[in-house]
Swiss-Prot record:
The gene is deoA. This is Thymidine phosphorylase. Homodimer. Pfam families: Glycos_trans_3N, Glycos_transf_3, PYNP_C. GO terms for molecular function: 1,4-alpha-oligoglucan phosphorylase activity; thymidine phosphorylase activity.
């Protein structure tokens, strides 16, 4: 029998907690015998004193096991269970293309996603722009759609990693969100509760990233790779660029529109194509569906070219309550803003930098993201047709198109976009889309 206050004291003093102590504390969080004050105290102790990798594995597994862990054996799927998680950014609509592409290559992707957080867009908010699409379903429906379509993207259900929900709510209001040990546990407990065989992490770097520096992003990627593999799930990570908006658009309906156009081949932004292909290839190799990068990319290009990936996206949408003709009539089904107008630069030159975070906040300011937890979103607003880093800017060349509902919204978004896009006389060096891969061998 342990005492919560003694576990807190031990961590406060910088000692490593045993697996049994961590399991006891997480069980207490799950059954409400440990209160918010004690959760907050342990979170702050971990923030200052950190956790060893063994402690992080124990925390992640205890949080994973605090609720239901999905099993897939009884479905006889005939393919590996594999997923991707992104630390979030602006215009990061990768999941909507990646899930169907990997499914079309023989993987099964049970993706449990999140809502928008701060300046970053949430995959669930994007899917909510599709009429009828249900992001909150029971586990039976989730398993059924994964089996039939090969992919389902839904929100966290109450019975998956419930301890994480309580811990996160306390971290959010006690300035302990930034602990890499606790971020690792929070991300992985939810992902591993899906019963994955392989996971690929997309850790963002740059002005629109969650982690403030390249070093912090690298540290998070290494922590996740070490802990996930320690918990028995084959995991690698890619560090990808978020120094500019990833897609051509940022918002909810506007990003779904771009995802559909990508899958059908109507338009593929080269940056998001590079990141999506790199992550998908990593997933196929990790899951044993391709032997190397070349084979993986050939398979992925084939399912884009033959329409199989697009067909699977349509099947997932229908399976989760969306329109049966969504892929054919997506433009009809997705909401549109009242005002769609360009914003121009005040002077000419080259785009030298972008405050990507500020561009995300411009979408939030128009109602496309949340200021408070219960906010209702306007799915139609957003930004599209972004200029890229290094492009030349003239007086008649728009920085972006603004999709707003009122003139007031348009004016505010326009000034935020103009402030966020830095213009100078010298063209900057091009940044890579993918900086590096981190696997077990790199730890």
């Amino acid at each position: 029998m342990f005492l919560p206050q003694e576990i807190i004291r031990k961590k406060r003093n910088g000692e490593a907690l045993s697996t049994q102590e961590i399991q006891f504390f997480v069980q207490g969080i799950t059954n409400n015998t440990i209160g918010e004050g004690q959760i907050a105290a342990l979170a702050m102790a971990v923030y200052f004193k950190d956790m060893t990798m063994d402690e992080r594995v124990a925390l992640t597994c205890a949080m994973r096991d605090s609720g239901m862990v999905l099993t897939w054996d009884h479905l006889n799927l005939g393919g590996p269970i594999v997923d991707k998680h992104s630390t979030g950014g602006v215009g990061d609509v990768v999941s909507l293309m990646l899930g169907p592409m990997v499914a079309a290559c023989g993987g099964f992707v049970p993706m449990i996603s999140g809502r928008g957080l701060g300046h970053t867009g949430g995959t669930l908010d994007k899917l909510d722009a599709i009429p009828g699409y249900q992001t909150s379903v029971d586990n039976d429906r989730f398993l059924k759609v994964v089996k039939e379509a090969g992919v389902a993207i839904i929100g966290q259900t109450g019975d998956l990693a419930p301890a994480d929900k309580r811990i996160y709510a306390v971290r959010d209001i006690t300035a302990t969100v930034e602990s890499i040990a606790m971020i690792t546990g929070s991300i992985l407990s939810k992902k591993l509760a899906s019963g994955l065989e392989a996971l690929v992490m997309d850790v963002k770097v740059g002005s629109g990233a969650f982690m403030p520096t390249f070093e912090a992003s690298e540290e998070l990627a290494k922590s996740i790779v070490a802990v996930a593999n320690g918990a028995g799930c084959r995991t690698s990570a890619l560090l990808t660029d978020m120094n500019q908006v990833l897609a051509s658009s940022a918002g909810n309906a506007v990003e779904v529109r771009e995802a559909v156009r990508y899958l059908t081949g109507e338009y593929r932004n080269p940056r998001i194509h590079a990141v999506t292909m790199a992550l998908c290839a990593e997933m196929l190799i990790s899951a044993g569906l391709a032997s190397d990068d070349g084979e993986a990319r050939r398979k992925l290009q084939a399912v884009l070219d033959n329409g199989k990936a697009a067909e699977i996206f349509g099947r997932m949408v229908t399976g989760l309550g969306g329109p049966s003709d969504f892929m054919e009539r997506y433009d009809h089904h997705l909401p549109k803003a009242a005002i769609v107008r360009p914003v121009y630069a005040a002077n000419s030159g080259f785009v030298t930098a972008m405050d990507t975070r500020e561009l995300g906040l411009a979408v939030v300011a128009m109602g496309g993201g949340r200021r408070a937890a219960g906010d209702k979103l306007d799915y139609a607003v957003g930004l599209t047709d972004f200029i890229r880093l290094g492009q030349s800017v003239e007086a008649d060349k728009p920085l972006a198109l603004i999709h707003a509902q009122t003139e007031e919204q348009f004016a505010q978004a326009a000034s935020m976009v103009q402030a966020a896009v830095k213009i100078g006389d010298t063209r900057p060096e091009a940044l890579p889309e993918v900086y590096r891969r981190i696997g077990l061998a790199d730890l």
